[in-house]
Amino acid sequence: MFLGGTISTPPASLRLRSTLNPQNAVTQSSSQATFPAAMQRKPPSYSISDEDLESRGFLLRRTTEGLNLDQLNSVFAAVGFPRRDTAKIEVALQHTDALLWVEYEKTRRPVAFARATGDGVFNAIIWDVVVDPSFQSCGLGKAVMERLIEDLQVKGICNIALYSEPRVLGFYRPLGFVSDPDGIKGMVFIRKQRNKK
């Protein structure tokens, strides 16, 4: 699925540095940058405010600091993802351009998670969108996705895609994702299994 909208590239001055890749960061002093009112971004409007989430005991995190990979792996398994090698999860997170996870304050455990990879300029793919089954239907998935999409757009990312199982397409559509926009089809390489003789 692809995030619907116009494909365009914002000026480099609007791109923010990545919180996960500081060695690639480009910063600009706010005193150097002035933008016409039409170019200034409005504050994001989320379905659940950060304050409301916090009042309910949910803490938003945008870095891997404090993220227990064994606990995250348990959330993956609880939603039906295969259990993963935590060393490989760590490598995947090192190559992640943006992420957002929710920590439940009472248990200090991750209860929702999503991440994105991409080229840092034009394209990103969202991966691993999960919400612990005990915390589903309270808006955490939507809260994570709204903020991750906003984080990518603020960086100037124009094309945002994700892979989705058919049963959850209805979750992504209200967020702006469309299947097969303008006839575009996603394709996946599948390694052929060798016949054992």
UniProtKB/Swiss-Prot annotation:
Residues 58-195 form the N-acetyltransferase domain. Optimum pH is 7.8. Residues 23-34 have a biased composition (Polar residues). Optimum temperature is 45-55 degrees Celsius. Thermostable, retaining 30 percent of its peak activity at 95 degrees Celsius. Its main location: plastid. Pfam families: Acetyltransf_1. Signal peptide: none annotated. GO terms for molecular function: aralkylamine N-acetyltransferase activity; N-acetyltransferase activity. One of its GO terms (biological process) is N-terminal protein amino acid acetylation. The keyword Cytoplasm does not apply. Disruption phenotype: Reduced melatonin content in flowers but not in leaves, reduced leaf area and biomass, and delayed flowering probably due to lower expression level of ent-kaurene synthase (KS) and FLOWERING LOCUS T (FT). It comes from the Eukaryota. The active site is at residue 172. Residues 23-46 are annotated as: Disordered. Belongs to the acetyltransferase family. GNAT subfamily. This is GCN5-related N-acetyltransferase 1, chloroplastic. It comes from Arabidopsis thaliana (Mouse-ear cress). The gene is SNAT2.
